[in-house]
Amino acid sequence: MTLKLYIGNKNYSSWSMRAGVLLRAFGIAHDEILIRIDGFDANSTFKTEVNQIGATGTVPFLIDTSVQDGHDQSLIITDTLSIVEYIAETFADHPIWPKDRAMRAKARNLCAEMHSGFGALRQHCMMNIGPDLSRAGALIWRDHAAVRRDVARIETAWADMLALSGGPYLAGDFSALDAYFAPVVMRLKYYSLPVTGESQT
């Protein structure tokens, strides 16, 4: 297998989840290697393992053993957005991004916004798939206007994309955009944050 995706626990690592969802959804063959996150200090097992591989000290990262990086090493692609773009270029026969130029630009815009924005939702609704966090979600929703603004912006963006594409996914067919917002769906679900009927589907 030439592609190796190194991830943290996808129950807690939203960025790992995004990359994993994308590769699985398009049936792209890869080995998935879990690095247990036991902390982020320099002496943690996580940092030690990641730094030994030569990445940036974060997950996910993708190694393509079929490509050299110019230093006689396998190519390492760090950061989820870079991984998405690398996969889109490498597997151009897969519709990683929408075919329509305008829709593709809008999808990239939203991925970039997700990449750098929605800080309140990330901060107060930590990624945690499984437990019922509805009581915590109710308090977060009550006490943090910034979270409410983030969710409102997400709902507006989703509604706009669905109106333009006709669904069933955000840009019509499944794309990187859906993989990017998959962890947001998990946060909305497990924290039971109020959303409209359209967002619930």
What are these model-derived regions, one by one?
Residues M1-W141:
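GST-like domain detector, emphasizing the conserved glutathione-binding G-site
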